[in-house]
Amino acid sequence: MNTSILIDSLIKNHSMHSRESNFYKEHEESLRQMLEMSDFNDGKSGKDSIMPFGNLDFPYREMGAINTIHLFGLDELIIFSYYWANKSRYKKVADLGANIGLHSMIMDRCGYSINSYEPDPMHIKIFNENVKNNNCSNISINQKAISDQTGTMDFIRVLGNTTGSHLAGAKEDPYGELETFSVETVSINEVLLNNDFVKMDIEGQEATAILSTNSDTWSNVEMILEVGTSKNAETIFNYLNQINVNMFSQKIGWSKVSSISDMPISYKEGSLFLTKADLMKW
C-alpha cells in the first residue's frame, strides 16, 4: 500500500483534518480504495507495505464485529502521520491501550523506544506474535491497564468487540456478552513522567486518569488521545484549563480548544492533543 503521498498530504494539510471537511472525505475514500486492494484483507497474505513506514506483516483477524482492516482508518493514519512528522522530536514514547500492537509497530518504524500497555491477555498473545514477525526491537510490552493508581482492578472484555474492552466502571451499560477478570493497573503519572510522548486510547478511563495528574506532570510530555463521552470531554476540558495544559482538537483542524464545543466527545469526532506548549508541532 503506497500511502506515502497520503501521509505527506496529511502532514502538510493538518488544518484540514476535521471529519466534516472535503479534504477528509476525499482522503478517506482514497484510503478505502487502497485498503480494498491491500494484502491485509481476509484471504490475503497479510504482508503489505504501508509507506513510508515500510513492509508490515499484519494478518487479517476478527475481534468480534471489528477486524484488523478497521485499524487502518483515516483517523489512525492521521495519528501515524503525526508520529512520522515528529520522529526527530521524541525519543521515548508510550502506547496506552495498545490492542494488538499496530500503533506500537508504526512507532517502532519511526525509531522511537516504545513502552506499550495492554491488559487483555488475548490481545497480548497476538501483539507478541506481531512484534516477532515484524522484527520490532524497540517495543517493551506491559500486560497492564492504565488508570489513576497502580494496583489491580476488574477488566471487562466485550466479546462482540474486544477493541472496546475496558476497566470496570469506565463505561456505562457495556453491551453484549461480557467476561470479567482481574488485571494489573499502572498509574498514568508513572508513564507521563518517563516518556516524551504518549498515545492513549483507554476506553472511557481517560478522565479518571487525567484527573490524577498535575501541572508538573505535563512539563516534558505530550499526548494524543481518544475521548469517549461528552461527560469525559467536559471533565477533561475543565480540569486541564485549571492546571494550564493546552488542548488541540482534530475536529477544529488541530486549533487550540477555547470552549467545550471544540472538544471531541467520541471517536467519531477525532482525537485530542495535550501539551504545555502553545502549538501542536507538525
Predicted regions and their residues:
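S-adenosyl-L-methionine
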Residues: M1-N138, D173-L178, N246-W282
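Short N-terminal helix/helix-N-cap motif within the alpha/beta-hydrolase-1
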Residues: M105, K125, G151, A207-T208
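A short helix->loop->beta-strand "cap" motif at the edges of active sites that frequently abuts
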Residues: Y112, W218-V221
